[in-house]
C-alpha cells in the first residue's frame, strides 16, 4: 500500500510537471512546478506512515545498514534485518517503502485454559547440558527483545518460562509461541514433578539422587497440590 501511494504521487507529480511546462504561460509553468513538488512531497511523506491497531504489533525489517554479526537473526544496533524493537498501537512515521518493510502481526492471546510455550530463535547458546533456558525472575523484561538480547543475556532455544493467560505484545520474529493446555490438578490428588531444568544434585556415595529438592533437576520431593498450573510441561513433567 505504501509503495502504491508513492508511485501514485510520482505519477501525479510528473503529470503536473508535463502539463505546466506545456503551457506557454510562465506563471502557469512556475505554479505547476510548485504544485507538482508539493504533491510529490505530500505523497512521499504519507507513504512513510504506518498504522498499527490496538490488537496488532508491527515487526520492522530494515533493508539498509551494517550486516548482522554471524549467527545473529535479530538486529539490536540498527543493522539491516528484523529489528528487536516492535511498533505498538498508533501511527508511525518515516518508514519509507524500499527502506523498511512492516509486518503486521496479531498480538499473542493466551486464554485462561492455556499456557504459552516460548522458544527464542536468537540469543546466547544454551549452557552445556541444558535443554531449556532457566526461568526468568522478571518475565516481563524477558519479553522485551532488546533487553533479552543485550543486558538480559537471554539464551536461544526453549524457555522454561511461559506465558500465562493474557494478551502480549512481543517480537514474534524472536519469540515463537506454541499454545498448550494448562495443567489442572484435581481435588484429592497431587502432582509429582520431574524437572528437566535446574542444577543436577550432587551424587552421594557414587549414586545419582532420584528424589531432589524443589528447583533441582530430577523428581521433586515436594508434590504439587490441587490447583491450575501454568507450567512448561516439556520442562516439568507432571504425573498425577
Give a label for each model feature:
Residues 1-240:
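N-terminal hydrophobic membrane-entry segments
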